Amino acid sequence: KRIEIKENNLNMVYEITDENEIKLLHFSNLPFDENDINSCEGTASFRPVEVLLSGLNRPGERHGTKYTYTAPGYRLKYKDMKDYRNETGRKLEILMEDKPTGLEVCSNIQFYDGISVIRSWTELKNNGEEDLGVEYVSSFALLGIDKEGLLSTDEKLEVLIARNAWQKELIWNRFSMDQLGMSISQPDKVRRSSQTISVGNTGNWSTKNYLPMGCLKNKETDSILFWQIEQNGSWYWEISDQDGHMYLQLSGPTEHQSHWWKNLKPGDTFASVPVSVGSACGDVEEAAGELTKYRRAIRRKNEDNEKLPVIFNDYMNCLWGDPTTE
């Protein structure tokens, strides 16, 4: 069974398999083409959520420390989907469960009317009888970010990374897959290396090395995928390859990268860090335009917006902390 979502120039395609598993096959401003899927495992690896609990075996074919074939993420079963509208736009809630542990997982997708951006987060609930140790949970997971177009990933894809630091703010750079260690070294259908393109932060200075943002440009299709992680603490995103395709996963803190760990007691719930993801035709300018509209939409109402006071920011010490009213 296929579920097609078309909203605000975004196209999403879910599949419910014969094994009662739900897959996210597509998220893009471009239309879905079945022939673009080129995986040795078919659609099996297109999981919408990855969640890793302590002490569980991960039997799938994977390499390195990347967050693929997580357990119980790989065995989650589809339970229900809610599709409704609220004050901001369309809302999807995809409910999954792992009966052996009693873990219930809800993937939340919030659309915003007229904006090609979603907000995504994951909610966990322990319906079992034992404590569960959470080491990782994705806020957004998408396999197949490379699938549109006929050229190789080396030829068509660019990753845009935003370095940021004290006195070195907002340094955006473009990289090819080869420059980041992800050049093609295996036949397309079986790519699953141990290499990752990983960017993150540990601690409450969330932008001390990088901005919690990124973009993936497909030069062949002239489309761009972009994202931000909405977190003032630890966060992490990674791009890598799995079963013939490349994936993007966004999250808050993790056990491996930032020594984060959550003990989920019976009856407890936990919500992951929210992230926003969008897609557009064009390049960074179009991505920035959609993201700016989204940021304006989510900003809470406050007195500053009404009174609009003039605030001087001594950015880059232009007046060395000694401004005047003149």
Predicted regions and their residues:
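Beta-sheet entry/capping signal
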Residues: W121, D131, T269-P274, P309
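Short, Lys/Arg- and Gly-enriched loop/turn segments at beta-strand edges
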Residues: G278-E290
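Short Pro-Gly-centered flexible turn/kink motifs
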Residues: K262-C281
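Polysaccharide-binding surfaces and accessory modules of carbohydrate-active proteins
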Residues: K1-D241, S258
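Short, glycine-/Ser/Thr-/acidic-enriched flexible segments
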Residues: N232, V277, N317
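An acidic-aromatic substrate-binding cleft motif
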Residues: A271, E290-E326
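Composition- and surface-driven signal marking solvent-exposed, interaction-prone regions
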Residues: E135-S139, A287-T292
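Short, structured beta-strand/loop micro-motifs enriched in basic residues and often containing a Trp
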Residues: M246-H256
